[in-house]
């Protein structure tokens, strides 16, 4: 981001792209369902990293572009887990759970709070795959927990951001917060 913002004339770029997935470990991503508290904790910790990433990228962008002519596009975000073992090899499919709803809500809150710079954000894939809003099986279709979070957040579209803050206790697991 620093190199782009420092060296590329603003009229040559509309935005800087950022990708971030809530991944436990890129080697063993963990299950999409039937996960334990440790996996849930690590997934949520990875999801909350979006706040840090957007804040740091925005600070660099503000340094070179205080008029906010260049946007931050979060091209891909969401939970990413290992493919279900019963699914054919080479096909990426993952079940969606309440953990994914929490990841979606946490991430959408970050985007709302940074709406002055984040002008576009795309869930990775919308149907059957990462952070899906719809799951299909032949002629059947279900709306996922992520879908319902998206539906709840649609009232934020073209709305006025009211800054709020709160204090809470940290959620910790062992020595990790």
Q: Where on the chain are the PLM-derived regions?
A:
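Short, glycine/acidic-rich beta->alpha junctions
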Residues: 1, 52, 99-103
């Amino acid at each position: 981001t620093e190199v782009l913002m420092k060296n590329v004339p603003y009229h040559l770029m509309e935005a800087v792209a950022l990708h971030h997935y809530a991944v436990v470990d890129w080697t063993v991503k963990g299950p999409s369902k039937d996960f334990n508290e440790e996996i849930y904790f690590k997934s949520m910790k990875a999801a909350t990293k979006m706040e840090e990433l957007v804040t740091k990228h925005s600070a660099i962008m503000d340094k070179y572009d205080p008029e906010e002519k260049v946007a931050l596009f979060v091209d891909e975000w969401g939970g990413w887990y290992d493919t279900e073992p019963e699914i054919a090899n080479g096909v990426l499919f993952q079940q969606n759970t309440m953990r994914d709803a929490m990841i979606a809500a946490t991430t959408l809150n970050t985007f709302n709070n940074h709406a002055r710079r984040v002008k576009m954000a795309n869930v990775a894939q919308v149907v059957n795959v990462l952070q899906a809003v719809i799951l299909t099986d032949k002629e059947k279709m279900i709306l996922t927990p992520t879908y319902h979070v998206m539906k709840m957040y649609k009232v934020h579209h073209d709305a006025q951001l009211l800054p709020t803050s709160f204090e809470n206790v940290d959620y910790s697991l062992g020595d990790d917060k």
